């Protein structure tokens, strides 16, 4: 096979709608270019800098066909590795290289990886409201659209300090009463189960805001509600507690969206302490490491549910789609409606149909990127207050 020489590497940091997105474009001497998702919405310009200033000169003139070797070169080039900024930058290039290979082969990515493991992948979406009646309306809408898996959240991750017993002159920010949250959420599960029966299966995301003993209590109390999974019940630096949780609760546990380093998942997978791996593909370095992680999980009976939030580009969403169609142990695909401006920048964004994502049949990843349209949406700094929730006494919660 003749070499496919990399002639340019570009990173684009944009904010077409609510979230900052980062996309990488790799160009070659064969006139074929590829796209990759490098979105780390909290540090978009840092990722762009790594791509433009460090990876670009490293990659120019190299053979785009040699994806494994190029991934290894990028991973060790800075010596220190496995951090979110570098991993996302590497991911953008890695996905783009797979996109190029698929186009050169005239094959969709899932076919390039080995073909279908299923006809379509079930999807789940998010029903979020401040009260039960509004939440029911959200659920009814999603049921009408064909969803049979719905993540249910009552309120967001925080609260109003004026409604909590806080010290005088509380620190400004988002507040979160862990005991009240557990009580309110369990009552929500019961109300939804009574109203809807088995019309759909609930999921729920704790977003790492409980202490270990609270997490065990909550998972045990959630057992009667037959959740598809309970997500991120602990922060990753407390995941050793999952061994105790697993021994005391049958509630399926999913975690992984904060993972960057293989050391964060190796023991969890080897010891079968989780049911679902929720890694974010760009956060772990792209398609190349995602395939290795998925196969490791498959050998240990752990299913895949890639993190697919609203702060992911349609390129990243499409990659998850391809992986989920191909991987034997893929279980479900998260999805949130893609806003209008984002759709104007990215062509071919995958959309669920009656609760499923079907294979993308275009060659490569199958997404287009309008650079002129993207230029209309420059990146904007956001403080992301929701990552800085506090307990009523003002203590910062570590997500």
Curated annotation (Swiss-Prot):
Entry keywords, A to Z: Magnesium, Metal-binding
Biological process (GO), any one: amino acid catabolic process
Family from the record: Belongs to the mandelate racemase/muconate lactonizing enzyme family. GalD subfamily.
Function according to Swiss-Prot or TrEMBL: Has no detectable activity with D-mannonate and with a panel of 70 other acid sugars (in vitro), in spite of the conservation of the residues that are expected to be important for catalytic activity and cofactor binding. May have evolved a divergent function.
This protein's name: D-galactonate dehydratase family member ECAG_02205
Molecular function, one GO term: magnesium ion binding
SMART domains attached to this UniProt entry: MR_MLE
Chain residues that bind D-arabinonate: 207, 257, 278, 307, 334
Name of a matching Pfam family: MR_MLE_C
SUPFAM superfamilies: Enolase C-terminal domain-like, Enolase N-terminal domain-like
Residues annotated to bind Mg(2+): 205, 231, 257
Presence of keyword Metal-binding: yes
Magnesium among keywords: yes
């Amino acid at each position: 096979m003749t070499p496919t020489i990399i002639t340019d590497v570009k990173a684009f940091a944009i904010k077409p709608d609510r979230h900052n997105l980062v996309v990488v474009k790799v160009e070659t001497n064969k006139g074929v270019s590829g796209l990759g998702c490098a979105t780390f919405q909290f540090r978009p310009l840092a990722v762009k800098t790594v791509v433009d200033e460090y990876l670009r000169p490293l990659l120019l003139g190299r053979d785009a066909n040699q994806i494994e070797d190029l991934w290894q070169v990028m991973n060790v080039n800075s010596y220190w590795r496995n951090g979110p900024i570098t991993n996302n930058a590497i991911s953008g290039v890695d996905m783009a290289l797979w996109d190029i290979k698929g186009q050169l082969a005239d094959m969709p990515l899932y076919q390039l990886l080995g073909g279908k493991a299923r006809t379509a992948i079930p999807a789940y979406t998010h029903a979020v409201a401040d009260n039960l009646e509004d939440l029911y309306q959200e659920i009814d809408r999603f049921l009408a659209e064909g969803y049979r898996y719905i993540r249910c959240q009552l309120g967001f991750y925080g609260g109003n300090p004026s409604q909590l017993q806080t010290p005088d002159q509380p620190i400004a920010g988002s507040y979160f009463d862990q005991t009240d949250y557990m009580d309110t959420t369990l009552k929500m599960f019961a109300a939804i189960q009574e109203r809807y029966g088995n019309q759909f299966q609930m999921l729920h995301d704790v977003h790492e805001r409980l202490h270990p003993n609270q997490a065990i209590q909550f998972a045990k109390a959630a057992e009667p509600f037959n959740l598809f999974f309970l997500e991120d019940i602990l922060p990753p630096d407390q995941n050793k507690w999952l061994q105790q949780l697993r021994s005391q609760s049958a509630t399926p546990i999913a975690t992984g969206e904060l993972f960057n380093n293989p050391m964060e998942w190796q023991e969890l997978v080897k010891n079968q302490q989780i049911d679902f791996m929720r890694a974010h593909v760009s956060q772990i370095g792209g398609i190349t490491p995602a395939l290795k992680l998925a196969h490791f999980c498959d050998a240990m009976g752990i299913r895949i549910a890639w993190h697919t939030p609203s702060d992911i580009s349609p390129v990243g969403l499409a990659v998850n789609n391809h992986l989920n169609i191909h991987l034997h142990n893929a279980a479900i695909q998260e999805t949130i409606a893609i806003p209008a401006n984002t759709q104007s920048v990215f062509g071919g964004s995958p959309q669920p149909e009656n609760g499923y994502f079907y294979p993308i049949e275009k060659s490569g990843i199958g997404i287009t990127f309008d650079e002129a349209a993207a230029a209309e949406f420059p990146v904007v700094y956001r403080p992301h207050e929701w990552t800085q929730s506090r307990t009523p006494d003002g203590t910062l919660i570590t997500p």
